[in-house]
Amino acid sequence: MKIVEGNLSVDKSKKVAIINARFNHFITDRLVEGAKDAYARHGGNPEELDLILVPGAFEIPFALDKALASGKYDAVCCLGAVIRGATPHFDYVSAEATKGVANVTLKYGKPATFGVLTVDSIEQAIERAGTKAGNKGAEAMAGLIELINLYGSLEK
């Protein structure tokens, strides 16, 4: 059986962007740093990444659609943090951001990863932004690098 999978080596011929939600920036800024670090650890130059800032996680799919439609980007790492509060707002934002990113990815046939934290507390967000539970921004970028290479293998 032939196994087809991506690897964790940056394809320097591909243009990559990060879309980051500014809401909860004390968390999302750490996710961006993790993503940049992962890109560097796997052979890329973080200075070659474009950072697209949006107000919140709900706006990520719109920016992703515009970025991929432009033809400028081969892949996008989407980052943000939605923290549960006392109202159902969390449920609406997290669900629509998730569905939106998935739909846009399928629409353009280009890889995007979903590094948007959906957590119950600030403590959980902090843990996932570089303390106890690693950095989910770094994980999202590593996944994106692997997907870029997998897509390349599947297109041949």
UniProtKB/Swiss-Prot annotation:
EC nos: 2.5.1.78
Molecular functions per Gene Ontology: 6,7-dimethyl-8-ribityllumazine synthase activity
Keywords: Riboflavin biosynthesis, Transferase
Top-level EC class as recorded in UniProt: transferase
Catalysed reactions listed for this entry: (2S)-2-hydroxy-3-oxobutyl phosphate + 5-amino-6-(D-ribitylamino)uracil = 6,7-dimethyl-8-(1-D-ribityl)lumazine + phosphate + 2 H2O + H(+)
GO cellular component: cytosol; riboflavin synthase complex
Residues annotated as catalytic: H89 (proton donor)
Recorded metabolic or biological pathway in which this protein acts: Cofactor biosynthesis; riboflavin biosynthesis; riboflavin from 2-hydroxy-3-oxobutyl phosphate and 5-amino-6-(D-ribitylamino)uracil: step 1/2
Superkingdom in the source lineage: Bacteria
Residue positions binding (2S)-2-hydroxy-3-oxobutyl phosphate: A86, T87, R128
Protein's UniProt keywords contain Transferase: yes
GO terms classed as biological process: riboflavin biosynthetic process
InterPro entries: LS, LS/RS, LS/RS_sf
Binding annotation for 5-amino-6-(D-ribitylamino)uracil: F23, A57, F58, E59, A81, V82, I83, F114
Family in the record: Belongs to the DMRL synthase family.
Record-linked HAMAP family: Lumazine_synth (MF_00178)
Primary role: Catalyzes the formation of 6,7-dimethyl-8-ribityllumazine by condensation of 5-amino-6-(D-ribitylamino)uracil with 3,4-dihydroxy-2-butanone 4-phosphate. This is the penultimate step in the biosynthesis of riboflavin.
UniProt protein name: 6,7-dimethyl-8-ribityllumazine synthase
Source organism per UniProt: Sulfurovum sp. (strain NBC37-1)
